[in-house]
Curated annotation (Swiss-Prot):
Binds 3 Mg(2+) or Mn(2+) ions per subunit. GO terms for biological process: diterpenoid biosynthetic process. Its EC number is 4.2.3.-. Mg(2+) 2 binds at residues 323, 327. Produces almost exclusively beta-bisabolene and only traces of alpha-bisabolol from (2E,6E)-farnesyl diphosphate in fragrance biosynthesis. Gene3D superfamilies: Farnesyl Diphosphate Synthase, Terpene synthase, N-terminal domain. SUPFAM superfamilies: Terpenoid cyclases/Protein prenyltransferases, Terpenoid synthases. It is an enzyme of class 4 (lyase). GO terms for molecular function: magnesium ion binding; terpene synthase activity. This is Beta-bisabolene synthase. Keywords: Lyase, Magnesium, Manganese, Metal-binding. Its cofactor is Mg(2+); Mn(2+).
Amino acid sequence: MDAFATSPTSALIKAVNCIAHVTPMAGEDSSENRRASNYKPSTWDYEFLQSLATSHNTVQEKHMKMAEKLKEEVKSMIKGQMEPVAKLELINIVQRLGLKYRFESEIKEELFSLYKDGTDAWWVDNLHATALRFRLLRENGIFVPQDVFETFKDKSGKFKSQLCKDVRGLLSLYEASYLGWEGEDLLDEAKKFSTTNLNNVKESISSNTLGRLVKHALNLPLHWSAARYEARWFIDEYEKEENVNPNLLKYAKLDFNIVQSIHQGELGNLARWWVETGLDKLSFVRNTLMQNFMWGCAMVFEPQYGKVRDAAVKQASLIAMVDDVYDVYGSLEELEIFTDIVDRWDITGIDKLPRNISMILLTMFNTANQIGYDLLRDRGFNGIPHIAQAWATLCKKYLKEAKWYHSGYKPTLEEYLENGLVSISFVLSLVTAYLQTETLENLTYESAAYVNSVPPLVRYSGLLNRLYNDLGTSSAEIARGDTLKSIQCYMTQTGATEEAAREHIKGLVHEAWKGMNKCLFEQTPFAEPFVGFNVNTVRGSQFFYQHGDGYAVTESWTKDLSLSVLIHPIPLNEED
């Protein structure tokens, strides 16, 4: 189906209409001229996914009413009188349950009140309180200096040895240390100290609850976790606690299921779109719709951003296919033609491409133009030039990597990363999300062009996404014949072993996070939710690539989480 069959956007840009006859290039179907991608077929049943559009988990009206009532109760809890440490712990639980977005203003108001409180006796000698206060304030945009931890060091400048026995304090210090900036050496020391000591005691912690929290944190710190994924885990964990607040737990479950129901409807519509494009029948490229929807929920899960998710998932699904064309399937001549067409944003010359590649190209054009039309209709802003520019820049980066491969050129790590932080493709998703969410008073041609120029916040996001991708996919992609990745570039450049190269890249990840953390506090033309989109795309990558390539290959851990986050609602007690 042509997205522009009846669209008025043709006045803005030449409409892309379905082409009845695409002249195939000689040898189009000749497998000996193509490298094999060896991708496994999708394990998801697309008929089932499509059915979610109409038969998804419908939340009962009584549960909606109950959720509204409980929401007011939780709001009263947050604003109620209690000891400062208890207030911090409540806010921490609310956030981990995935409810921060429901109480954003109340949480910030309470935290600011605690920040302005001149009394420090309640936290200054309490490692848990100091670290929890530090993390929650920084997470919510209130700067706290690192030297609040100086009081926990001895005369020699090291963390006091007796802190090794304070497991809860160590855990809070560990989580706080991940919000550090470049140059904050004390937080680097805190990260090393807490990590070492938590690893030493993790198997001997007497409290089962605390032990599980420690192991979970060592596997993935909170600051690197996607909120929606973390909420699903923590709801189950919170239910096991001795001092669980039953109404808070009930509200978390209800809200999770309500949002899940909305996501299911979106996923069903996207699955239908995907099947209608016909691209699901192309065997030489990845079919990644489900993974991309999970990624979309990591980027932004809140119900009001359905259009952002829809555009992000469609673009990401097409990006995966275009990436495969450049990396594996297309000849250099075809890639030159493809890039030129995208750069001109004009399909003249498409008849020089094979039918399979033309289908992908036309779907890309139609989808981008439809997103542009929706922006014009809903926001009165022509976003097509900016979306087209992002696609063109991405394809040029892909082409450079293809030329490296075909010529046998081996880039330095720095050269590779400069290209790779854009070729990882998230600039396109971020540009589109910016166009969809920036306030109309601030949305201008110049501001959108600035996002496309890859400013520092977007740059750190791209760099981290690239590094995580390479750590998880490097070996498999080299086996498929892809261009060298950062690990191989470093090995070639320095003579390091693969193990040493991986450690170096992991070090770059930590440093890039520090840069990202600082960007969150610097003066910037960006505001929420766009700032959050940049951080959250990285958290999605961290999840998919932490144990290998959970994106290209649907591994057990990604499928299990997808089922629990998107398909299966959280069971409620019978009285609920």
